[in-house]
Amino acid sequence: MSNINLATLDISEHPNLPSSSAVLFEAKAKKKLSFEAIASAIGRNEVATAAIFYGQAKASAEDIVKLSEVLGIDHLYLESLLSGFPDRGKSMTFPPKDPLIYRLFEIVQNYGYAYKAVMNEKFGDGIMSAISFSTKVEKETDLDGNNWAVVTWRGKWLPYSRF
């Protein structure tokens, strides 16, 4: 287990995150758990689980119970931290400063209109939902041994209403 890469949090670099983030990340580090392990234990997708840690997704009552058990955090305390609604989108500056997050922003900046055009041709006038939405990250290794990140976005298509 000592060879595992773990995402941690320096809360001083992220002052806009909710107080729950520091508590969750501290317990995660103490238990030496990856998001994949935590997600498996609570029955959620690892990106959705990480979003709870960053205050960008709502934890269900069942999530809170399971997170409490997995991370060893008092249930009532964790419930008090996570029972509200997320204040999404305030956790970082814009454009993002972190290189990986900036590259995700850059992908949308560079290919956004191309995505839009292709989606409009396939589905008509509308948008892809980020609410009726799921995402996942997978790792692929090619024949030369190079690692590739495979990010999948799956959003419900919402046609614009005519009125």
Swiss-Prot record:
Its EC number is 4.2.1.104. The keyword Methyltransferase does not apply. NCBIfam families: cynS. Pfam families: Cyanate_lyase. GO terms for molecular function: cyanate hydratase activity; DNA binding. The gene is CYN1. The active site is at R103, E106, S129. Belongs to the cyanase family. InterPro entries: Cyanase, Cyanate_lyase_C, Cyanate_lyase_C_sf, Lambda_DNA-bd_dom_sf. The lineage of its organism: Eukaryota, Fungi, Dikarya, Ascomycota, Pezizomycotina. This is Cyanate hydratase. Keywords: Lyase. Catalyzes the reaction of cyanate with bicarbonate to produce ammonia and carbon dioxide. It comes from Paracoccidioides brasiliensis (strain Pb18). One of its GO terms (biological process) is cyanate metabolic process. It catalyses: cyanate + hydrogencarbonate + 3 H(+) = NH4(+) + 2 CO2. It is an enzyme of class 4 (lyase). SUPFAM superfamilies: Cyanase C-terminal domain, lambda repressor-like DNA-binding domains.
